[in-house]
């Protein structure tokens, strides 16, 4: 009986911990992403559904892969009311290039904010011939 109560207490504690973690807003994985990318966007509707469309510019000379965008829906005071993470179509963004994106909005809001949530840069290894 004591073991059962202990297991239940442990499960409740784990659920409480997960709930408090889930309540934290998402933030970009790479602080300072703005040094490498510029994002512009505007809201629009397609068949009565809200979307954001815009462009992401890779101002760094290296291809970015697995690019994900973080879309924040904000209320009139700037507080986050909803968030979503979306993959950039194609997921690759060559260096010094611009790519168009569209993201469906889950919850309409007063304003939106789009940031680069995650990415990897492809750095190629250079193989030097060995001297004889």
Task: Indicate where each model-derived feature is located.
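Short, solvent-exposed, Trp/other aromatic-anchored flexible loops in extracytoplasmic proteins
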Residues: 82-112, 116-122
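Transition segment at domain starts
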Residues: 20-49, 123-132
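A short beta-turn/strand-edge loop motif at beta-sheet boundaries
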Residues: 61-66
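Bacterial N-terminal signal peptides that target proteins for export
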Residues: 1-8
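Asparagine-centered strand-capping/turn motif at beta-strand->loop junctions
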Residues: 56-60
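Beta-strand signatures of extracellular beta-sandwich domains
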Residues: 68-72
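Short aromatic-acidic-glycine turn motif
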Residues: 73-82
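Bacterial N-terminal signal peptides
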Residues: 9-17
